Regions:
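Conserved glycine-rich Rossmann-like NAD(P)H-binding loop of the short-chain dehydrogenase/reductase
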Residues: 76-94
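Conserved NAD(P)H cofactor-binding loop of Rossmann-fold oxidoreductase domains
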Residues: 136-141
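C-terminal helical subdomain
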Residues: 226, 247-290
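Residue(s) in the substrate-gating loop at a strand-loop-helix junction
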Residues: 186
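Substrate-binding pocket helix/loop in short-chain dehydrogenase/reductase
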Residues: 144-145, 149-154
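Active-site helix of classical SDR
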Residues: 168, 202
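Conserved glycine-rich cofactor-binding loop
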Residues: 61-62
């Protein structure tokens, strides 16, 4: 037998073995997901008596939060009210007027401790059950370490991380079996992003917090999903993110390609959460991004981002 024939057989065996291992792990993963879905389906419905079932949405005044409110209003059965939380009362009131479901408007700045106290008081005094919690409040600013002010960096950490954790912990005592939580992370959580470093790091924190929280809440039959979209082209996020860049200077990110509409993100992530899945990547590009972030070295991902942001 020649060397080439031997090499060919070795390669064939390796490919065949790798394929069998991959199929085995895929089958195991599918079985585990199905078991988890059955556990959720078998969870006893909470006996809430006279309590109203509400959906609590932060960052509801615009963008993705607004789309979640509209979609829940159209599709979520059994909700008595949708609680809308954001800073801009006028926008919240305008959105409340568009919804058919009952609403409760809470104009709060979640970076302030007194706002968390007000939220907790409202939940307790209203005697409600939080059926759905969606943490959409978020902030991103583009720029390297020299371009971003300390205030910009601190605000991103406050809104994206501390406020999300505080709202979640505040709402959890009011949730029962069958409750659902969606934490809005980002594909930025999958790798470091130069010129977007603080934002990406803040989303890494929220992503890992959400994954850990999901395991902690399994015994309570509360479904927790980390929602990781790519750019959303029809929200205020991109204009606000670019606000830190001075006029006339070369932009750190030239194009925001492969963006998806916010309503698609809301629709797909809600469906993923209902199925009890841990992560939602609502779009082809963000799904590919997540897959390759697990395979490729960080250095390769960093150089790929460097290329992508210059296109």
């Amino acid at each position: 037998m020649s060397f080439l024939e031997t090499l060919h057989r070795v390669v064939d065996w390796c490919v065949g073995f790798s394929g069998r291992v991959f199929v085995l792990f895929a089958v195991i993963a599918i079985v585990l997901v199905l078991i988890e879905m059955l556990v959720y389906a078998a969870a006893k419905k909470p006996k809430t008596g006279h309590k109203k079932r509400v959906a609590l949405i932060t960052g509801a005044s615009s963008g993705l939060g607004r789309e979640y409110a509209k979609r829940l209003d159209r599709t979520e059965r059994g909700l008595d009210e949708i609680w809308l939380v954001a800073r801009r009362a006028d926008r919240l009131n305008a959105l409340a007027g568009e919804l058919g479901c009952g609403t409760h408007v809470l104009p709060l700045d979640l970076t302030k401790p007194e706002s968390l106290t007000a939220l907790k008081t409202a939940l307790r005094e209203s005697d409600v059950e939080v059926a759905v919690l969606i943490n959409c409040a978020g902030l991103g600013k583009i720029g390297n370490y020299a371009k971003l002010s300390l205030a910009d960096s601190d605000n991103m950490i406050e809104v994206n991380d501390r406020a999300a954790v505080d709202v979640t912990v505040t709402a959890l005592p009011f949730m029962g079996p069958g409750g659902r939580i969606l934490e809005i992370c980002s594909t930025a959580a999958f790798q470091p992003l130069q010129h977007f470093g603080v934002y990406a790091a803040s989303k890494v924190f929220l992503y890992h917090y959400t994954r850990a929280l999901r395991m902690e809440l399994l015994p309570r039959h509360i479904r927790v999903t980390a929602v990781c979209p790519y750019w959303m082209r029809d929200t205020e996020f991109i204009p606000i993110a670019k606000a830190a860049e001075a006029k006339g200077e070369k932009p750190a990110i030239k194009n925001f390609a492969f963006g998806v509409p916010a309503d698609r993100v809301a629709r797909r992530s809600l469906r993923t959460n209902r199925l009890g899945m841990a992560v939602s990547t609502p779009g082809l590009f963000c799904t590919i991004h997540r897959f390759f972030s697990k395979l490729l070295p960080r250095e390769v991902l960093l150089y790929f981002w460097e290329l992508l942001r210059r296109l």
